[in-house]
């Protein structure tokens, strides 16, 4: 609306998707709802690399960013490669991340379902 003349650097973090020990009305996915808002960037990390890189990128972004976290991923341990711990490590918002390359099928997922997709890729 401002033609790029104004910035709104703010980060919103929130739980999204299926959760443990809550009613069905509390386990909805807001990714498409937020994603349909013009100018609002939405990220949904899966592993430690995504969390660190995307949250740092969100904090540095001049536009509003929503970070959608799956509660069931809290407490899940991932190995952190050395490059992830580098102080300059960030993941570019808006660019797809390829977790596993293949030649027969493309599987697209976000958040918790990335893990399930990688399992499915092994079977396929």
Regions picked out by a protein language model, each given a short descriptive name:
Residues 1-116:
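Conserved thiamine diphosphate
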Residues 116-124:
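Short helix-loop-beta junction
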């Amino acid at each position: 609306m401002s033609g790029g003349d104004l910035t709104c650097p703010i980060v919103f973090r929130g739980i999204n998707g299926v959760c443990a020990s809550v009613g069905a009305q509390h386990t909805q996915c807001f990714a498409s709802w937020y994603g349909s808002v013009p100018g609002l960037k939405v990220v949904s990390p899966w592993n430690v690399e995504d969390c660190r890189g995307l949250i740092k990128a969100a904090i540095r972004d001049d536009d509003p960013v929503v970070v959608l976290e799956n509660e069931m991923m809290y407490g899940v341990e991932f190995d952190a490669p050395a490059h992830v711990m580098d102080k300059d490590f960030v993941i570019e918002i808006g660019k797809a991340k390829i977790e596993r390359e293949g030649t027969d099928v493309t599987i697209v997922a976000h958040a918790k379902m990335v893990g399930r997709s990688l399992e499915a890729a092994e079977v396929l």
